[in-house]
């Protein structure tokens, strides 16, 4: 069930995402708007956000490209668009199981233009 739509922007682009109705998605929306410094790990962008959450039922480590994830251990939003350094197949493999919040609405490969240190801005659409 759709809970909210957010906009994720960085210096060279922006994408929309649809969030499902989960406890972590609600906590993320309550923290918006926010900015953070991007880090990259293979074909994944992640950044720390001021959200605390517990691992939810249904948390996953291997997800489809374009999944919006929350890495509980690092209090970070994780946005994979392809293989990570620990991927075994074509799908992204996250560093550990993460809460699944929703899905990027556009072309997740656009995140390839994000560089470590870029400012990421998240807001409600």
Regions found by a protein language model. Name each.
Residues 1:
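Extended, loop-rich substrate-binding clefts of extracytoplasmic carbohydrate-active enzymes
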Residues 4-5, 9:
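Helix-rich terminal scaffold detector
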Residues 14, 20-27, 31-125:
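Glycine-rich active-site loops that engage anionic ligands at enzyme catalytic sites
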């Amino acid at each position: 069930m759709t809970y909210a739509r957010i906009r994720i922007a960085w210096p060279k682009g922006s994408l929309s995402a649809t969030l499902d109705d989960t406890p972590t998605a609600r906590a993320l929306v309550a923290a918006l708007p926010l900015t953070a410094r991007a880090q990259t790990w293979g074909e994944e962008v992640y950044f720390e956000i001021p959200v605390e959450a517990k691992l939810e039922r249904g948390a996953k480590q291997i997800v489809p490209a374009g999944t919006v994830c929350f890495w509980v251990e690092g209090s970070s939003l994780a946005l994979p668009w392809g293989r990570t350094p620990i991927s075994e197949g074509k799908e992204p493999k996250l560093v550990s199981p993460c809460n699944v919040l929703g899905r990027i609405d556009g072309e997740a490969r656009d995140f390839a233009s994000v560089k470590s240190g870029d400012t990421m801005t998240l807001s409600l659409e």
